[in-house]
Amino acid sequence: MLLAWAAATAVLAARTLRLSLSLPTINVVRAAPSRNRLPAYLARATAIAAVITQAGIAVTGSVVRVTGSGLGCPTWPRCFPGSLVPQPHPEVATVHQWIEFGNRLLTGLVGLVGLACLVVAVAVRPRRWRLVSLAATMPLGVVVQAVLGGVTVLTGLTWWTVAVHFLVSMVLVWLAVLLVAAFTEGDAPPRWHLPGPLRGLLYTATTVLAALLVAGTLVTSAGPHAGNTATPRLTVSVPALTQLHADLLVGFLGLLVGLGFALRAAGRVPARTWRRYLVLVCVVLAQGTLGVVQYLAGVPEVLVSLHVLGAASVVVVMAALWTSCRVRDDLFAVTVGSARPLASAGTG
């Protein structure tokens, strides 16, 4: 049913675009470059580091889960009562302690990168509150994740806390990609390269992707890698959840196919949008193939972590496609014979 719906949506969008859509030409006077305290390449590199670390900690979190190391440090924020670091313990394997402790240390690195993003955004002149607000989500997200991590440990790896932990990571990955674009865009309202029906298709695909990620966490919550052997699982049939996950994937792929036809029918689409679209299709196909192999192979630990990496990669490329579909110009105020900048390049 999802595939039929996606195909019908694609046909409708393509026909509509062929009949009547054309993009208006808008002339915008750009503001003069501002004097920033830091070079642009450094700002962008900091944001890219945020993407990598946010995605990376999702993967290392999956390693903690599939190895049963979630309670390797049974207390939080200390590893053991009276000790921040692992200690010899007759009931907790040393390797599990260090896997969990290493993941907690990586949280510190993610936090430092998040703070660096905020410092860089604050250093941009003139001050851009939109950019600062977006950058602030990086360190704030780490705080939220730290609290969730503590709740997860203290509740004995309850399945819903683990699921929320992962989904918040995916939101932060998306925001980090927007932050990368923010340092090279303006603060004006977005001007879309895509007409209305095509934007609707993009919104729908993004919504289905979100549902696909949620379904994936539910499959994990009911399966063998929800945590330690004693961790309570989600009491729903794994085959039923897996089928739901697969159906959503088929629907998502159908929407991507429809989006491709619609982009071709629209014309005047930037080359970078096409490139990111093709990369997205390839990544989604690879992720889907990996999911099938993982299921048929009995859900081995290594493939589970690779599947998490694939999920983060899909989010990265989808967010990058989103940012390539619109332009944000510089804000400015026009007086007689002059243009006075109000803000320089902004967020998306």
Language model features: what each stretch is:
Residues W5-L12, V110-A116, S169-T184, L248-L259, ...:
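Hydrophobic cores of alpha-helical transmembrane segments in multi-pass inner/ER membrane proteins
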Residues R44-G70, A210-A215:
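N-terminal signal-anchor transmembrane alpha helix
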Residues T53, L140-G141, R199-T220:
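Alpha-helical transmembrane segments of multi-pass integral membrane proteins
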Residues V64-C73, V143-F166, A222-R233, G288-A312:
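Interfacial helix-loop-helix junctions of multi-pass membrane proteins
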Residues R65-E100:
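Extracytosolic (periplasmic/ER-lumenal) interhelical loops and adjacent juxtamembrane/interface segments
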Residues H89-V110, L241-H245:
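Individual transmembrane alpha-helix segments
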Residues A121-A136, F261-L280:
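Membrane-interface helix-loop-helix junctions at transmembrane boundaries of multi-pass membrane enzymes
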Residues L212-L253, V257-G260, R264:
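Membrane-interfacial catalytic/cofactor-binding modules of polytopic membrane enzymes
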